Swiss-Prot record:
Coiled coil: none annotated. Its main location: secreted. Heterodimer of an alpha and a beta chain; probably disulfide-linked. This is Conodipine-P1. Residues 1-24 form the signal peptide. The modification 4-hydroxyproline is found at residues 38, 42, 49, 137. PANTHER family: AGAP006772-PA. It is found in: Secreted. Transmembrane segments: none annotated. Catalyzes the calcium-dependent hydrolysis of the 2-acyl groups in 3-sn-phosphoglycerides. Residues 98-130 form a propeptide. The active site is at residue 54. GO terms for molecular function: phospholipase A2 activity; toxin activity.
Length: 178
């Protein structure tokens, strides 16, 4: 019986820690609509963590002194970081279903000319050759730039200048580090 009490206390402490972590994560989606677009786009789900931070930044940025430009720049940086996490697979976003996997294979074959062009360069490390490969229409970096341009051009109406400070209490950890 004496051994049971410490185990129960430890389980309770771990449970509370887990609940706080879940609550903290959930609070970061309070003002987020994900990567909302009228169409389903590649990388949309993969970029969701960056979109959540960006949505919170648009909602609470003025409260914490973060400009719209800083929100957008942090958004691009966060998406590029996600792309870099893919490592050597950064040429494409992770596929979500069989249809996307199949279309990805077909697209890879269709874009094989880009690889040939890059390999024909004097050096594979040639900057233009690398850019041609990384910014193909299915690349993670290509879509990161597209998402960034969309919010940069069309996001002005969504950036809130009249947010109630109470709405943003406890959300500073959900904003970009600027």
């Amino acid at each position: 019986m004496k051994l049971l009490a410490p185990v129960l206390w430890a389980m309770a402490a771990l449970g509370v820690t887990w609940l706080v972590a879940v609550d903290s994560k959930e609070s970061c989606t309070k003002h987020s609509n994900g990567c909302s677009t009228p169409l389903r786009l590649p990388c949309q789900e993969y970029f969701r963590p960056a979109c959540d931070i960006h949505d919170n930044c648009y909602h609470c940025g003025t409260i914490f002194g973060i400009s719209r430009k800083e929100c957008d720049d942090a958004f691009l940086k966060d998406m590029n970081t996600l792309c870099k996490k893919l490592g050597s697979n950064s040429a494409t976003c992770p596929a979500r279903g069989k249809r996307e996997v199949t279309s990805h294979r077909a697209t890879s074959i269709a874009h094989s000319r880009l690889w040939k062009t890059a390999l024909d360069q004097k050096s594979f490390l040639n900057r233009k050759a690398r850019q041609a490969i990384l910014l193909t229409p299915n690349s993670c970096l290509y879509w990161a730039n597209n998402f960034y341009m969309a919010v940069h051009v069309f996001g002005a109406r969504s950036y809130s200048r009249t947010t109630d400070p109470k709405d943003c209490q406890g959300l500073k950890h959900c904003l970009p580090n600027h």
